């Protein structure tokens, strides 16, 4: 059997991890052993927060829709119920965008929702 020396592979792996840790503070960006831990933890946070981002944006949209609906004299839950009864299928992302950028259009939606209740 031929002897296998892993210097090139180990160096490449170290370089890869240290490149991923670029910009981290102190030893986290310089020391391989610490950088591995930092990069692994960063990956866990990224994985978790890609899922949390969806929840947080939905919460934000609901807050914006609720605020705009209450300005027009209707609570969020009654507004959504009215839209469903009026068979208006607009998702919360678009409703929030309309609420922020087109108050008159949102007021018209609120009136349709009130009429359907």
UniProtKB/Swiss-Prot annotation:
The keyword Ribosomal protein applies. Signal peptide: none annotated. The keyword rRNA-binding applies. One of its GO terms (molecular function) is structural constituent of ribosome. GO terms for cellular component: ribonucleoprotein complex; ribosome. One of its GO terms (biological process) is translation. Gene3D superfamilies: 6.10.160.10, Ribosomal protein L20 (1.10.1900.20). Binds directly to 23S ribosomal RNA and is necessary for the in vitro assembly process of the 50S ribosomal subunit. It is not involved in the protein synthesizing functions of that subunit. Belongs to the bacterial ribosomal protein bL20 family. NCBIfam families: rplT_bact. HAMAP family: Ribosomal_bL20. This is Large ribosomal subunit protein bL20.
């Amino acid at each position: 059997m031929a002897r296998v020396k892993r210097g090139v592979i180990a160096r490449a792996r170290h370089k890869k991890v240290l490149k991923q840790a670029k910009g981290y503070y102190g030893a986290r960006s310089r020391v391989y052993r610490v950088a591995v831990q930092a990069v692994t933890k960063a990956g866990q946070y990224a994985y978790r927060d890609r899922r949390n981002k969806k929840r947080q944006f939905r919460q934000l949209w609901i807050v914006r829709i609720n605020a705009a609906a209450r300005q027009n004299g209707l609570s969020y839950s009654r507004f959504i119920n009215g839209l469903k009864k009026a068979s208006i299928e607009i998702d919360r992302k678009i409703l929030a965008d309309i609420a922020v950028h087109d108050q008159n259009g949102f007021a018209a939606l609120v009136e349709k929702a009130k009429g359907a209740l």
